[in-house]
Amino acid sequence: LMTNGDPSDGWDNVNYIDKVFGTGLTQKHNVTVQGGSEKTRYFASFGYLGQKGNIDNFNYSRYNVRANIDSEIARNFKFSLGLSGVLSNRHTPAFNSGGTDANSYVGEAGWLSIANQTIQMHPYLPEKYDGLYTASIKKNTTLPQSPLAAIYESGYKKTRGVSLSVNAAISYELPWVKGLVLKLSGSFDWGSSYNKNLNTPYNLMSYSSGEWKKTADPRGNGDGNNLGEGSSYWQQLVGQASVSYVNSFGKNNLDLLALLEVRDARSNNLSAYVKE
């Protein structure tokens, strides 16, 4: 029955490890431009990282840019400007790919992970029976294990992140006092993240004690969808004014610095949850 090629009888011969785990793909691209003259130097870098997991529906992408310029804009005046930014996107099913249960905050990540459900799945069960994904019952529990349903029917987790950093500085070396430098500098950092988690309950056909039985997914979500959304942002502004003096007198070195710093940091978090 397991080899007759007809899974409708409730028997099959499926390698669930091969069904779940495929070949992942990682690609990374970078473009760099740099150059300048005797008094000005510039640098720019653009990068992309894309990852497709060896389990379906696990994807990650990241774009990053970095640029800076250093210039002597006038005699004894120096100026620098830097910019960096990152944009990232992550998409996964509602179940984790693997992990342990050590952190109670994230729930039973290892116990119900797709990897754990895969090794619990019986190869003689067809992928679907009576129109539903099949499941085996984890030993000493009542939890149905169905890795394919966990991948394709459990919902999703989406996370998008954006960060930006800008810094600038200007300095002036006083020509009539050797080693005395006045400097103004500032930086601005900003970041935000957005996440959306959708849990969609699903039914399974589990096989236990010689009979098929319709069961709910192991999360026990009931009949309604659960949707959670959240966003957060943070920003920090730093300004500095300094006077430095560096000089040598014979075998003695003198290094003095007076610095004033102003800092302002803010953040905000917002989340919402709804159940159908």
Language-model features, listed with the residues they occupy:
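Intrinsic-disorder/low-complexity, polar/charged segments enriched in Ser/Thr/Lys/Arg/Asp/Glu/Gln
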Residues: 28, 163-165
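Outer-membrane beta-barrel architecture
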Residues: 32-34, 45, 68, 167-171, ...
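Short, charged helix-to-loop "capping" segments that act as catalytic/coupling loops
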Residues: 166-183
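Residues embedded in well-ordered regular secondary structure
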Residues: 1-56, 94-97
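Outer-membrane beta-barrel channels and translocator barrels
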Residues: 26, 37-38, 72-74, 173-177, ...
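Surface-exposed loop/interface segments of Gram-negative outer-membrane beta-barrel transport/assembly proteins
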Residues: 1-12, 53-60, 64, 68-163, ...
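Secondary-structure boundary/capping motif
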Residues: 39-41, 163, 179-180
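Generic structural signal marking isolated hydrophobic packing positions
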Residues: 44, 138-142, 168
